[in-house]
Amino acid sequence: MTRDVTLSLAQEFGLDAAEYQRVLDIMGRTPSFTELGIFSVMWSEHCSYKSSRHWLKQLPTKAPWVIHGPGENAGVVDIGDGLAAIFKMESHNHPSFIEPYQGAATGVGGILRDVFTMGARPVANLNALRFGSPDHPATKRIIDGVVRGIGGYGNCVGVPTVGGEVNFHPSYNGNPLVNAMTVGIAPKDRIFLSAAAGVGNPVIYVGSKTGRDGIHGATMASTEFGADSEEKRPTVQVGDPFTEKLLIEACLELMATDAIIAIQDMGAAGLTSSSVEMAGKGGVGIELDLDAVPQREEGMNAYEMMLSESQERMLMILRPDRQDVARAIFEKWELDFAVIGHLTDTGHIVVKHQGVVEADIPLDPLAEQAPLYQRPTVETPKRAPLGEVADPVGIASALLTLIGSPDIASRRWIWDQYDSTVGGQTVRRPGAADAAVVRLDGTERALALTTDCTPRYCFADPEVGGAQAVAETWRNLTAVGAHPLAITDNMNFGNPQKPEIMGQFAAAIRGMREACLTLDFPVVSGNVSLYNETEGTGILPTPAIGGLGVLDNAETATGLSLRPGLDLVLIGTGGTTLGQSLWLREIAGREDGPPPAVDLAAERRHGDLVRSLIHQGKVAACHDLSDGGLLVAIAEMAIAGHTGAVLSGEGDHVFWYGEDQARYIIATTYSAAVLDAAKAANVPASLIGRAEGTDLQVPGCTPISVATLRERHEAFLPALMAQR
């Protein structure tokens, strides 16, 4: 069923009056219903990045080890031994609020396709999740659905979920964030790209059949939520991980031949986006015959087929003489294979259905010449200095509260639902180290992987928060001994039409840029998710960062577990500020002050020292300092190693719980050598304790048993999920 095309319909589809007038000018006539649908999804924020492209161009994307940066399906970096790592992070926020299980599951499926479409076998999944307040009535249901969706899809496909992070905050009550990251490995000289070439070459559809699920999903992801959000369930796609597994194997088998000229997954905006992007990048036209599209529902019209976001589908341009080879491979894997069109020299996308031309649109205005806005920005006001904050409970009592608080408590309930070791290459499992470590099959080397962001810092000062997210990612890779190579970003923000939101976005980009430049840590891929608001209430600005590093020897990867007899050396100083700290929020009940400053030169200097010490074999365990500060980090190491510690540091609650940056705890039997190396590198360092016994002993405090800390640490999520 179609309707007459009017301004009112265009606005329903997400276009504003000026954009609709632009469509009329481009077409020289009123567009058809299908043409309007194509314009609306291609010009949505989700596909066009029309509010963010101006700012994203400021991020550094080049380095000698970067093979492909932003613009392809995923980023590609040289990791040595003739191999490339291909990785990206992407959001599935809006679908995961409406239908948590399928929203999260198809988020995993979509990011897997972005990676294997470039020729990589996926070797690891990670995620970054933000949920509402633990006491909000929807939070438990959303956590349950999201975690089951991620685990169900990843486990069935056979790709380990090796790491991630979780935050809780009331700003996510009506808008959880589900950011999924996949990493794959490919020969660096066998990377497959999406630019179509060769007028007359066939356009091939492979994978699952097309249904009505997900229609206008890209448009739904480009608007904020209201009271009718539950009615948007039909715009959430339905995933089938078993078909995805078959699709991975079939595509990789075909990629071992010389049949493929270009390949693209059908993600947001489905067949529309994949065909427009492939032809647009290649500078050719494309003609589609929708009668040939495999369909699983009867009576689908052109609009529905072009905008469906049914999962597990790919579009390819093949060499005509290799078409039979490709067909045989996909039929062997019991997947649909159909010739649905060909490339032309018109520079247009032409869509035919039942002998009727349903769409004929020039490609450039849909892609490269899509609307681009430099929206007004308002800077986030600087927070007033915090001043002195009294300690109302004491050091020991605060630790028992913090170690079990929502943002610090163990995530075991979550990661136990993920298969983190399928494939047999996982060296460091969730919770065992600051970053996941995955061995490169057939070599001694390994990848280190992590996701990081501190949204409360970003809300207080987006520029500092953006820099801190990149710096913490770099620290976590460093803490396992990896050389950090590159990042992927997932920019989760509110309504870009509000100047204060665009001000947050622009400032976060500035902070990220400075951190990436100072740390030689380029951005090679990413995703922007805007309109994360419900009934006018926006999320905390959340520029999630996914980081990738490489270790020359997987066996040298450092964990965070203490063992008896190790000295504890603090790299950096004790805490000096409580601004935006978890101590301030959980103990004092406040969320004010500026976040801790980020000294990027110190980050570089301190991290390079730590990595050097790990490579010299002088570090038995290492943990970066972040949420909760120094004492929480030591407690986490004690819990991981089932070992206590006697601490010698003299300090107040600011010293123990301040969240100053550029800091690590090193556990070592070479403390004198570590301190000498730190002095030579102009890095502050001090001996602050020794691992022994079964209690954590802080000067002036009653000892706390590690067993008690573990019990508190493990209790939060099981208790939350057991509530009725």
UniProtKB/Swiss-Prot annotation:
Belongs to the FGAMS family. Its main location: cytoplasm. It catalyses: N(2)-formyl-N(1)-(5-phospho-beta-D-ribosyl)glycinamide + L-glutamine + ATP + H2O = 2-formamido-N(1)-(5-O-phospho-beta-D-ribosyl)acetamidine + L-glutamate + ADP + phosphate + H(+). SUPFAM superfamilies: PurM C-terminal domain-like, PurM N-terminal domain-like. This is Phosphoribosylformylglycinamidine synthase subunit PurL. InterPro entries: PRibForGlyAmidine_synth_PurL (IPR010074), PurL_linker (IPR041609), PurM-like_C_dom (IPR010918), PurM-like_C_sf (IPR036676), PurM-like_N (IPR016188), PurM-like_N_sf (IPR036921). Mg(2+) 1 binds at E90, N527. GO terms for cellular component: cytoplasm. Part of the phosphoribosylformylglycinamidine synthase complex involved in the purines biosynthetic pathway. Catalyzes the ATP-dependent conversion of formylglycinamide ribonucleotide (FGAR) and glutamine to yield formylglycinamidine ribonucleotide (FGAM) and glutamate. The FGAM synthase complex is composed of three subunits. PurQ produces an ammonia molecule by converting glutamine to glutamate. PurL transfers the ammonia molecule to FGAR to form FGAM in an ATP-dependent manner. GO terms for molecular function: ATP binding; magnesium ion binding; phosphoribosylformylglycinamidine synthase activity. Keywords: ATP-binding, Cytoplasm, Ligase, Magnesium, Metal-binding, Nucleotide-binding, Purine biosynthesis. It comes from Granulibacter bethesdensis (strain ATCC BAA-1260 / CGDNIH1).
